Amino acid sequence: MKIFYRLFCSLIVFAALIPLNAQVTEGKQTVAVLEFEGRGISQLESKTLTDRLMSEMVNTDAVIMVERNQMDEILNEQGFQQSGCTSSECAAEVGALLGVQNMVSGSFGKLGNSYTIDAKMFSVETGATIRTVSKTYKGAVDNLLTVIEVVAWEIVGLQPPQDKLD
């Protein structure tokens, strides 16, 4: 009898959490991020920085992100290669395959001691640019991660927290 009672209580708690989860995701846009192009940095560095941008976008809690492994799996099933996909048309095609509302593409660059981040979010359905963010940072690469946090907040349409701007 005790087992049935615990099972019943667990089911009630689980049922109560389902609407909560629906409320949390309500109104959020689904987004996928293409691997950013690296200019003056290695492909590995570009991939690492892209992954960091994705993580920071998730941390804003403003979007529902398609995870990299899910994205790769879906694209592989469709026989689609993401590498070299830098045009808006190609990115929109990827977004349609993934079933997302918006895509983010862009580049990381390095020229001397300066780093640049250029990001663009656009609608998969219409191809219209929703938002662009460009940042330049001069200094050690370690501090570039803070700039990526700011870009993540801005690309999803939010004001970055003050501690990210200091």
For the regions a language model picked out, list residue spans one by one.
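Positively charged n-region of N-terminal signal peptides that target proteins for export
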Residues: 1-6
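Bacterial N-terminal signal peptides
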Residues: 7-19
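Conserved Rossmann-like nucleotide-binding pocket used by diverse enzymes
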Residues: 16, 32, 104
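C-terminal/domain-edge helix-coil "capping" segments
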Residues: 23-32, 50-51, 56, 60, ...
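Acidic/histidine-rich, surface-exposed loop or edge segments in extracytoplasmic proteins
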Residues: 29-39, 75
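Solvent-exposed coil/turn segments that connect beta secondary-structure elements
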Residues: 36-39, 63, 68-71, 80, ...
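Residues that form or flank phosphate/diphosphate-binding pockets in enzymes
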Residues: 40-44, 146
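Short, solvent-exposed, polar/charged sequence segments at loop or secondary-structure edges
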Residues: 44-51, 60-105, 109-115
